[in-house]
């Protein structure tokens, strides 16, 4: 079986639609040879490899053999610098400009490896806006909470996927984490004991300190802090889960329904690297508020 991708795969609503369409058309195949044709694809935002990789891993979990064919040179170069194509028979090439945040898959028990990964490949980049030590600590914990949420809430057995990219000409850095789990809608619906849409579930999960995490130590502050930070920074926060898509930018939020559901949850954060402001915490939060 062969499936073709469109001309552009960007980290936006249309990019999610393109990849979830691929999943919808291929997810029921078993023991097949599946070719993903990239002949028409002239641009692929590297951080979307987290989403693409999760989908292809899911297809492989159905005992299919998955191959990428007709990859154009520019796209091959992008996806070889971050190590994505090494999983599909290609050789990595040096990232001489140091703009790639490598594509990785983590098991749910790999929390220490993920922590080290975000520390070395994302947090310590000198392109990030200047932050106080306290805020940098909270920022790091908020990114880690995305992984923690995937472990605690998704019930995934196929792992957690991440990738990122610095775009110097556009003055931004994007980082994406995807899991193949039950999704936000199911978790929130069960917690509220009310069947709600995926859009409504994402909106609920991003409001104040709402969380489905139970016990004496609450969660939920991670997305709140990231949202407040990107409001000031001029960045963007996106979440896709099931057939829900949510985006926050320019201090406002919007949501849409995806035509084809994503089999888990994706969180994408985009940071404006042209931001010359310095940031500190406005309140003295306790580290235990997040974990």
Which residues does each predicted region cover?
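Flexible, glycine-/charge-rich segments associated with ATP-binding catalytic modules
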Residues: 1-30, 89-90, 192-196, 207-291
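Amphipathic alpha-helical interaction surfaces in cytosolic regulatory modules
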Residues: 5-88
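ATP-lid-like helix-loop hinge signature
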Residues: 150-191, 249
């Amino acid at each position: 079986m062969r499936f073709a991708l469109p001309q552009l795969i960007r980290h936006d609503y249309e990019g999610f639609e393109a990849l979830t369409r691929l999943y919808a058309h291929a997810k029921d195949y078993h023991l097949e040879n599946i070719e993903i044709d990239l002949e028409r694809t002239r641009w692929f935002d590297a951080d979307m490899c987290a989403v693409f990789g999760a989908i292809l891993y899911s297809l492989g979990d159905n005992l299919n053999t998955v191959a990428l064919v007709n990859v154009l040179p520019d796209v091959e170069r992008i996806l070889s610098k971050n190590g994505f194509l090494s999983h599909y028979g290609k050789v990595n090439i040096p990232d001489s400009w140091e703009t790639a945040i490598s594509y990785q898959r983590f098991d749910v028990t790999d929390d220490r490896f993920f922590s080290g990964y975000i520390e070395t490949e994302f947090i310590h980049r000198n392109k990030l806006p200047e932050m106080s030590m306290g805020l940098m600590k909270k920022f790091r914990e908020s990114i880690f909470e995305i992984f923690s949420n995937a472990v605690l809430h998704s019930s995934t057995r196929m792992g957690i996927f991440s990738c990122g990219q610095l775009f110097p000409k556009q003055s931004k850095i994007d980082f994406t984490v995807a899991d193949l789990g039950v999704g936000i809608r199911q978790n929130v619906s069960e917690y509220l004991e009310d069947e709600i849409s995926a859009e409504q579930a994402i909106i609920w999960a991003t409001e104040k300190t709402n969380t489905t995490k139970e016990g004496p130590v609450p969660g939920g502050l991670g997305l709140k802090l990231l949202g407040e930070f990107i409001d000031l920074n001029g960045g963007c926060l996106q979440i896709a889960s099931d057939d829900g898509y949510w985006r926050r930018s320019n201090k406002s939020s919007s949501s849409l329904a995806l035509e084809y559901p994503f089999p888990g949850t994706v969180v994408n954060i985009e940071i404006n690297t042209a931001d010359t402001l310095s940031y500190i915490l406005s309140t003295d939060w306790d580290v235990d508020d997040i974990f």
